[in-house]
Amino acid sequence: MHEQLNFSTGSPVKIKWCDYDHFKYPLHFHSEYEIVYIIKSSGKRFVGNNIEPYLEGDLVLLGSFLPHTYKSDPVYYQNNPDFRVNAIVLQFSKNFFQYAIGNYPEFYKVKNLLEEAQYGIYFKSCKETDSIKNKLKKALNLKNIDLLIECIKILSLMSTTENKELLNEDYFRPSIR
């Protein structure tokens, strides 16, 4: 399913707090990049051809047009208020950094990160990823230029950490017809 995201404010960055009884999105893709931070939930994460369990603290960066979905564990479908999905999702336009990446050396590592994101990137838990997660929580309360700046800081941290792994071995792009 191709998801068309609405950036109603005209901003290239969108952040949302997710509070669901279980994940409800089918397998989908969109042109925007997406950072998903699972605060509370467990289940299976589907990214391209990769299927792996996810737990609380899971942090991934998904590239443009990379198919993905999350399937909650069965306990989340039993209407138990103790089992809820809480997550932060930060989405940004693939054109957001296009000029800066091509013209400023300060964005070289971010450019490499976004190229790697086409495979899906899982960030292993460590001090650096804790800092990224804290910045995502902070970003929930930001708007306008402050949100844009925080997004750049988050991507900068992601680009410098060594504690990450690609989720797919091959570049995965769905056929759009």
Spans of features found by a protein language model:
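A hydrophobic/aromatic-rich effector-binding and dimerization subdomain
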Residues: H2-F7, L66-N134
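Generic anion/oxyanion-binding catalytic loop in active/binding sites
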Residues: K24, F46, Y99, L140-K143
